[in-house]
Each structure stands twice: as structure tokens, then as C-alpha cells.
């Protein structure tokens, strides 16, 4: 992505995030943005919106479908993007808003990868430790299973990783034996 595009994305996302914080609607916007992001990624919408061959009005109609199920603040934001013919940047702006909102509120989605599914009790005990060790607040937990870890888990949030898997420990032992 070129610098000009990044500047355009920031032009929309920065004021929107500031407005969300002023209005105190972080929880609702986090929820709305996360749901839209999941739908957009599953449907391959970013590539559709970036296609030059697709008419601008079709792109605007497509992103307008999201307006019915989100907060009024986000409805207006989507409308501004459509009005300014920025539907092609919809996904990029959405992701940037989510990232900026996470940084501003220090509330992040945490990904926990383990060899076996964690119980609710394990998650409950783990969350305060994650918040303390990573100096952040857990907004949501995304759980992944990776049997190659053998045991233990890997925690990822805010570009930080805590790896206490048996796979990692074996790797360290192997390196020390060289």
C-alpha cells in the first residue's frame, strides 16, 4: 500500500476513532467492527471492492448493506465513505479503525493457541495473568487448536507473544544442546 493510500485511510479512521471515544461507544463499535470484519473476510469482499471493473455505485450499494445492523455512528461513517467514493478502501479503513481503537483503549483481542481446547476455568484463570504480563485489557479471546504444540499454549496480543508450549521448550533444549 502506498503512502498516499495510507494517508487517505488515516484521514477517515483517526477522526472516527476520536468520535467513538468522545461518545463512549467503544464497546458497541468494537462489536460492530469485529462482526463486519469477519463477514468481509469470509466473503472475499476486499478483492471485490478493489476491482476497477466493478462500478462505483455497485461498491457503494454493497457496503451500504452493513448499515442496517450497526450503530448509528457507524451507519453515518459508512455513509460518508460511500458519499466520498471510498468504498474501495472500506476494508482497509475498517481494519485501521479497529487497530486504532484497540491502541487508544488498550483493549485487545487475544489469541490463545493450545494443543487441546481450554476449559472455561482455565480461560478464567489465564485472563488476569495475560492482562498483567502483557499490560493490556482483554477485549475478546480467540481460541485456536494446534496439536503440534504437544502441550502448553501460545498467547498473542498487541504484537506480543508468550510461548509456553512444549514444542517451544523442546526447541530451546535442542538449541542448548548444539
UniProtKB/Swiss-Prot annotation:
Pfam families: OSCP
Cysteine-cysteine disulfides: none
Transmembrane spans: none
GO cellular component: plasma membrane; proton-transporting ATP synthase complex
Subcellular location, principal: membrane
Key word Disulfide bond present: no
UniProt membrane topology term: Peripheral membrane protein
GO molecular function ontology, one term from the record: proton-transporting ATP synthase activity, rotational mechanism
Compartment list: Cell membrane
Keyword terms, alphabetized: ATP synthesis, Cell membrane, CF(1), Hydrogen ion transport, Ion transport, Membrane, Transport
Factors inducing expression: Induced by a decrease in external pH from 7.5 to 5.7.
HAMAP family hit by this protein: ATP_synth_delta_bact (MF_01416)
Subunit structure, as described in the record: F-type ATPases have 2 components, F(1) - the catalytic core - and F(0) - the membrane proton channel. F(1) has five subunits: alpha(3), beta(3), gamma(1), delta(1), epsilon(1). F(0) has three main subunits: a(1), b(2) and c(10-14). The alpha and beta chains form an alternating ring which encloses part of the gamma chain. F(1) is attached to F(0) by a central stalk formed by the gamma and epsilon chains, while a peripheral stalk is formed by the delta and b chains.
Protein name: ATP synthase subunit delta
Amino acid at each position: 500500500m502506498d503512502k498516499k493510500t495510507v494517508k487517505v485511510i488515516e484521514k477517515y479512521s483517526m477522526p472516527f476513532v476520536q468520535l467513538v471515544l468522545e461518545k463512549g461507544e467503544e464497546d458497541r463499535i468494537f462489536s460492530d467492527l469485529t462482526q463486519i470484519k469477519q463477514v468481509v473476510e469470509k466473503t472475499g469482499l476486499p478483492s471485490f471492492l478493489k476491482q476497477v471493473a466493478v462500478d462505483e455505485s455497485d461498491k457503494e450499494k454493497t457496503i451500504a448493506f452493513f448499515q442496517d445492523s450497526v450503530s448509528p455512528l457507524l451507519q453515518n461513517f459508512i455513509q460518508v465513505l460511500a458519499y466520498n467514493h471510498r468504498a474501495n478502501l472500506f476494508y482497509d479503513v475498517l481494519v485501521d479503525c479497529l487497530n486504532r481503537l484497540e491502541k487508544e483503549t488498550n483493549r485487545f483481542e487475544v489469541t490463545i493457541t493450545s494443543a487441546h481446547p481450554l476449559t472455561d476455568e482455565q480461560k478464567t484463570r489465564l485472563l488476569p495473568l495475560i492482562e498483567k504480563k502483557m499490560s493490556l485489557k482483554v477485549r475478546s479471546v480467540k481460541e485456536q487448536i494446534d496439536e503440534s504444540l504437544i502441550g502448553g499454549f501460545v498467547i498473542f496480543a498487541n504484537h506480543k507473544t508468550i510461548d509456553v508450549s512444549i514444542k517451544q521448550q523442546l526447541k530451546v533444549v535442542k538449541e542448548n544442546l548444539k
